[in-house]
Design a protein with these regions (language model features):
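Secreted/periplasmic serine-hydrolase-like ester/acetyl group-modifying domain
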Residues: 1-55, 151-169
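Alpha-helix N-cap and loop-to-helix initiation/capping positions
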Residues: 34-37, 77-82, 124
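Extracytoplasmic/secreted proteins, especially bacterial periplasmic and envelope-associated proteins
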Residues: 41, 85, 89, 127-132
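Active-site segments of SGNH/GDSL-like serine hydrolases
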Residues: 50-76, 104-106
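A cross-kingdom marker for long, charged
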Residues: 53, 103, 129-133
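Substrate-gating cap/lid alpha-helix
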Residues: 68-103
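Acidic carboxylate-rich catalytic motifs and surrounding loops in phosphoryl-/glycosyl-chemistry enzymes
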Residues: 100-112
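Histidine-centered active-site loop/cap adjacent to the catalytic His
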Residues: 117-162
Length: 169
């Protein structure tokens, strides 16, 4: 089921939403300025609220962006390493707050690599959203201090080595 039935869904619909650009040869580093920006934004917009409300449990999640997003937004633009370092920093900071629960789904490769779940590079189907909520309710795919590095190592390896040309075959 799709939350936007008037829209086209699936591989062909996703591929129509962007023109694939050649990959940049240089990759953008995660700079100290990037680090400060992430830290300041998280502190101001998330962590301060969580700390001020210790009686509330906050739920956040990293959505399962499609393989086409990884290709068009990170790989082609040379932003992959920078994004992964930013994600890691964000996750570690969020996990410092004991009243924050962080879930992550970019390791659900059966979702991210199946463009039938998407209408563009980021918007997934209602069924996918329902599945994410079921997992969250069951406490599945929650990052912890013990799992965060394994999670990011796993997705970094997968997306860094994916055959992105196969999307277009």
């Amino acid at each position: 089921m799709h939350w936007a039935p008037e829209r086209d869904w699936g591989r062909e619909a996703v591929l129509k939403t962007y023109d694939r650009e050649p990959r940049k040869t240089e990759t953008a580093p995660f700079t100290e300025e990037d680090r400060r920006t992430v830290m300041e934004n998280l502190e101001q917009n998330v962590l301060a609220t969580a700390r001020a409300n210790p009686q509330v449990t906050f739920y956040y999640f990293i959505p399962p962006y499609s393989i086409s997003w990884w290709d068009s937004e990170l790989m082609a633009k040379g932003e992959f390493e920078r994004q992964m370092e930013g994600y890691r920093l964000m996750a570690r900071m969020l996990l410092e707050c004991k009243n924050i629960r962080l879930f992550a789904f970019d390791d659900q490769f059966d979702i991210t690599c199946n463009l039938d779940h998407y209408m563009d590079v980021i918007h997934y189907s209602e069924d996918t959203g329902d599945q994410l909520l079921e997992w969250m309710a069951a406490g599945e795919h929650m990052l912890t201090d013990d799992t965060v590095d394994f999670y990011f190592d796993r997705i970094t390896d997968f997306y860094a080595n994916y055959d992105y040309d196969s999307i277009y075959e």
